[in-house]
Amino acid sequence: YRNWLAQDDTLSELLELINRQLTEKGLKIEKASAAVVDATIIQTAGSKQRQAIEVDEEGQVSGQTTPSKDSDARWIKKNGLYKLGYKQHTRTDAEGYIEKLHITPANAHECKHLPPLLEGLPKGTTVYADKGYDSAENRQHLEEHQLLDGIMRKACRNRPLSETQTKRNR
């Protein structure tokens, strides 16, 4: 059903309908001044891991494993465990109401999937996101669309975060 909902904007239309009803009932603020972006792993149905699994850079399994029912799902290693599935990138308003979803294979990196989540945000909205969305391209996109930068900073190799950046991330 996830694939069916993601096709032809059905999921977007459903979220729009739910948010409109919440606004009409006075349960949701029409225009929030902040947007929160995050990603979560959605595991697909499959057999439990019974052997060590080796995965290449594209999330394809090298070696023999039990075949999955879902050929679009990809493997990702999280907290030392391999998971087969998708990554759901979500934009919520400041109150936590979901406004937009974007689904990718689990091995897709967050930083390349921020712009689709920001479509339709009014100018001046602060966008908060974790370090996975930290990139020069995303900061430029925010600037071009006159959105305020609330993305956490990520330390680079041999360049730790400054004290100011560390405090800002909290």
Can you describe what each PLM-predicted range is?
Residues I41, K167-R170:
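Short amphipathic alpha-helical "interface-anchor" segments enriched in bulky aromatics
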Residues Y1-K154:
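Polybasic low-complexity intrinsically disordered regions
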Residues C156-P160:
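Short gly/pro/ser/thr-enriched loop/turn and capping motifs at secondary-structure boundaries
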Residues E163-Q165:
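Active-site-proximal loop->helix
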